[in-house]
């Protein structure tokens, strides 16, 4: 069971839908979040893409030397970069980071944004182009280890004698992650990706998606691993956690929610439609309306695109819900929380000890100063509490 965190390159705050409590997405701040994740024992971080985000490859590259073991799940958008250039970019990053690159293929679902980026393809065509893109990307990198070139003649993309002179550390190529809820997305995942990633839907819905992708992959003689993308709001008690959830959306008004939901409704993303369906366009915002499954809260999705649900509860309850998803076949959990720096610590401190995960060996010298809290009376090292 691997735990990932999230680099908030599209902004961070204590509240949704307001500039109150907002933080600047500076080089210093994203470095703080990455270093915290690395120090706390998260396996990696997801770095998103889109016009609302800083460029994921620039951000990820800036964090290589600030971290020691952290893996970088970097978003890659077909249509914004030629596959051969994407292969060179990925290979350079993988070498410079010592083999810490993971790639998240993002097809995109906001037609307005896509057209602004010069991509004028419908839903079916985008998946065709994405499949061709990632095939070329994979094969160019795989061929680099033997020094061979690669040809491809597809409907949307073609390369002739494509060659990568400097191969990746990871063989045959850095692992490819991908998420999508349509049949076309499941087909692409089954054929080409290593980890299928789903947003945090109720367990029954997640189980259906896993079964679909797993069945399609098995028919091709392939196996995949599975991940889930969620927010988390954990506190020492259930009451405190739900109060924090209410606080997160306390600045939202009907106009802001309606504008956000109208924007989401214009997208042709099946996954985004599934997220929106969980909260009925935000017409009501009580816990009873937004708790769509035990401890699974859809409040984030009122105004945030993409992953719109959070696990909410005390440490024991959150750990139990995580284990329920793991029992479905989820191997990797990608979490985030507002604000991302403090919540990275809170989640790791409260929930990590309760999970059946591999505890990383501490780096040399890392344990010499704790963690054990502040020394008592200048002479006594604190012990764990009895509770």
UniProtKB/Swiss-Prot annotation:
GO MF, one example: alkanesulfonate monooxygenase activity
Keywords, comma-separated and alphabetical: Flavoprotein, FMN, Monooxygenase, Oxidoreductase
One Pfam short name: Bac_luciferase
EC number annotated for this UniProt entry: 1.14.14.5
Top-level EC class: oxidoreductase
GO term, biological process aspect, one: alkanesulfonate catabolic process
Reactions the enzyme catalyzes: an alkanesulfonate + FMNH2 + O2 = an aldehyde + FMN + sulfite + H2O + 2 H(+)
Gene3D superfamilies: Luciferase-like domain
Family named by the database record: Belongs to the SsuD family.
NCBIfam families (alphabetical): alk_sulf_monoox (TIGR03565), PRK00719.1 (NF001939)
Record function comment: Catalyzes the desulfonation of aliphatic sulfonates.
Protein name (database record): Alkanesulfonate monooxygenase
Biological classification of the source: Bacteria, Pseudomonadati, Pseudomonadota, Gammaproteobacteria, Lysobacterales
Gene: ssuD
């Amino acid at each position: 069971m691997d735990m990932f965190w999230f680099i908030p390159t599209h902004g961070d705050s204590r509240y949704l839908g307001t500039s109150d409590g907002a933080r600047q997405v500076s080089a210093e701040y994203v470095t703080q979040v990455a270093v915290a994740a690395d120090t706390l024992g998260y396996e990696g971080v997801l770095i998103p893409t889109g016009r609302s985000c800083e460029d994921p490859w620039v951000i990820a590259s800036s964090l290589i030397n600030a971290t020691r073991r952290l893996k970088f799940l970097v978003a890659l958008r077909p249509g914004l970069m030629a596959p051969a250039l994407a292969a060179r970019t990925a290979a350079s990053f993988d070498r410079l980071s010592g083999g810490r690159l993971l790639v998240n293929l993002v097809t995109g679902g906001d037609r307005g944004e896509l057209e602004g980026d010069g991509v004028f393809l419908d839903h079916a065509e985008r998946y065709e182009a994405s499949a061709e893109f990632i095939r070329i990307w994979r094969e160019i990198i795989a061929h680099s280890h033997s020094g061979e070139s690669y040809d491809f003649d597809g409907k949307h993309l073609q390369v002739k004698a494509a060659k990568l002179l400097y191969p990746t550390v990871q063989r045959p190529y850095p692992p490819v992650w991908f998420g999508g809820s349509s049949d076309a997305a499941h087909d692409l995942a089954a054929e080409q990706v290593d980890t299928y990633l789903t947003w945090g839907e109720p367990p029954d819905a997640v189980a259906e998606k896993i079964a679909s992708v797993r069945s399609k992959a098995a028919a091709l003689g392939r196996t995949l691993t599975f991940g889930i993308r969620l927010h988390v709001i954990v506190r020492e008690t259930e009451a405190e956690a739900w109060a924090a959830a209410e606080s997160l959306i306390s600045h939202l008004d009907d106009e802001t929610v309606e504008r956000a939901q109208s924007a989401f409704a214009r997208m042709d993303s099946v996954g985004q439609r599934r997220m929106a369906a969980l909260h009925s366009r935000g017409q009501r915002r009580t816990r009873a309306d937004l708790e769509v499954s035990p401890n699974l809260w859809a409040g984030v999705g009122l105004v945030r695109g993409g992953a719109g649900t959070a696990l909410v509860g005390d440490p024991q309850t959150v750990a139990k819900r995580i284990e329920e998803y793991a029992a479905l076949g989820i191997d990797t959990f990608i979490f985030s929380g507002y604000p991302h720096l403090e919540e990275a610590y809170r989640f790791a401190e409260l929930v990590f000890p309760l999970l059946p995960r591999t505890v990383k060996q501490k780096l040399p010298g890392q344990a010499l100063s704790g963690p054990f809290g502040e020394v008592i009376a200048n002479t006594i090292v604190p012990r764990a509490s009895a509770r």
